[in-house]
């Protein structure tokens, strides 16, 4: 029988964006149930909320098919260990946050043993591999969706799902304040500033950081007073960035690596170069023009290209239903093209103003009390 005062809630996340969602979820659950206990796999932000992580979350932060194949034995070992540990601990509910290829397998095994399961952040079934919907309905009791077009797919398949809004839209202010952001970071108000967001995973840094830094050098030729800001999500990414920056060709690049503070960095920027993923939505909610880029192994790219069912990869473009911002991917992700696209935003404020109106409408659409809605659903599944 569930102890309604101190339920044991298992949570598993695979990367930095999931760690942030997990931290907010823990905080929201504690408001409703102060004695709740949390265990599973989490990152630094979740640990700061009192979460007990049984395995290193960084070991799951891999990108793309080819990268997963190389690390598959270790990932499967961690998953088997987590299932074994949770079957022993018998949590009142399991919440898998994103990382569906890892978490849904855990959820399915726990659900068969009678443990209620929730998947928080629907996989992009509306974009590719839509056949997964029926399987997901079988694997979990409930899906918590961040985007409004997602729940109906699960409802049509006989599952339970709801739109809880996107946490960033709820947490981030609707209005823009570049001046305050620049003051916070100690950046001159009158100079060109570009933010570089190469990704939160070490594997993304390996692919994207050299290209982004080469792009910055080209922008510096065009705007000699420019400065570049880069928020590092974790200590692991910070260490890898430092290694890349030690290369001779990047000596003298006026780039500041900042601990986290990605929102402040984006608000301080005139334009943002960002790797496709959750970060693109954060940039949009900051009302900043961006150029979206992505490079992955040829094997992964060939697989994804065959499967994808939508014309865009960037979340802002998908949600707005048009290419509102440029996407330069794979062979198109060349420093010369990226620099030209960023310069186009910097030199055309009228285009930026129109884009900001689109981003404001998107912000209003996604704005809900996400963490509280998710907490309510999780506690309901736990019987609290």
From Swiss-Prot:
EC class, as a word, reads transferase
Q: In which pathway does it act?
A: Bacterial outer membrane biogenesis; LPS lipid A biosynthesis
What keywords sit in the KW lines? Glycosyltransferase, Lipid A biosynthesis, Lipid biosynthesis, Lipid metabolism, Transferase
Which PANTHER family does the annotation name?
A: LIPID-A-DISACCHARIDE SYNTHASE (PTHR30372), LIPID-A-DISACCHARIDE SYNTHASE, MITOCHONDRIAL-RELATED (PTHR30372:SF4)
Q: What does this protein do?
A: Condensation of UDP-2,3-diacylglucosamine and 2,3-diacylglucosamine-1-phosphate to form lipid A disaccharide, a precursor of lipid A, a phosphorylated glycolipid that anchors the lipopolysaccharide to the outer membrane of the cell.
**Family the entry assigns:** Belongs to the LpxB family.
**Protein's name in the database:** Lipid-A-disaccharide synthase
Organism of derivation: Neisseria meningitidis serogroup C / serotype 2a (strain ATCC 700532 / DSM 15464 / FAM18)
What lineage is on file?
A: Bacteria, Pseudomonadati, Pseudomonadota, Betaproteobacteria, Neisseriales
Name of encoding gene: lpxB
């Amino acid at each position: 029988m569930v102890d309604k005062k101190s339920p044991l809630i298992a949570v598993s996340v695979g990367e930095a964006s999931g760690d942030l969602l997990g931290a907010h979820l823990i905080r929201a659950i504690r408001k409703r149930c102060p004695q709740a206990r949390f265990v599973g796999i989490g990152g630094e932000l979740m640990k700061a909320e009192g979460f007990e992580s049984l395995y290193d979350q960084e070991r799951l932060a891999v990108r793309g098919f080819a990268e997963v194949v190389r690390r598959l034995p270790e990932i499967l070992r961690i998953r088997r260990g987590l299932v074994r540990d949770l079957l022993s601990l018998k949590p009142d509910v399991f919440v898998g946050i994103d990382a569906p290829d890892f978490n849904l397998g855990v959820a399915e095994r726990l659900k068969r043993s009678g443990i209620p399961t929730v998947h928080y952040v629907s996989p992009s079934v509306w974009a590719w591999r839509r056949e997964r919907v029926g399987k997901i309905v079988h694997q979990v009791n409930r899906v918590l969706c961040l985007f409004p077009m997602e729940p109906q797919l699960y409802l049509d398949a006989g599952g339970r799902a709801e739109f809880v809004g996107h946490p960033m839209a709820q947490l981030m202010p609707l209005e823009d304040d570049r001046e305050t952001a620049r003051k916070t970071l100690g950046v001159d108000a009158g100079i060109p500033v570009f933010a570089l967001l190469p990704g939160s995973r070490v594997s993304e840094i390996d692919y994207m950081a050299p290209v982004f830094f080469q792009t910055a050098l080209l922008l510096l030729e065009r705007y000699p007073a420019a400065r570049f800001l880069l928020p590092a999500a974790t200590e692991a990414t910070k260490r890898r960035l430092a290694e890349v920056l030690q290369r001779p060709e990047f000596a003298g690049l006026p780039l500041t690596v900042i601990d986290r503070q990605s929102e402040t960095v984006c608000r301080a920027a005139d334009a943002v170069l960002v790797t496709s993923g959750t970060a693109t939505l954060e940039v949009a909610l900051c009302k900043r023009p961006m150029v979206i880029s992505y490079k992955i192994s040829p094997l992964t790219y060939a697989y994804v290209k065959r499967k994808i069912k939508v014309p865009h990869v960037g979340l802002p473009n998908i949600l707005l239903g048009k290419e509102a911002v440029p996407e330069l991917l794979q062979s198109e992700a060349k420093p010369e093209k990226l620099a030209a696209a960023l310069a186009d935003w910097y030199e055309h404020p009228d285009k930026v103003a129109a884009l900001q109106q689109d981003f404001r409408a998107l912000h209003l659409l996604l704005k809900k009390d996400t963490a509280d809605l998710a907490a309510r659903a999780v506690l309901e599944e736990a019987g609290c």
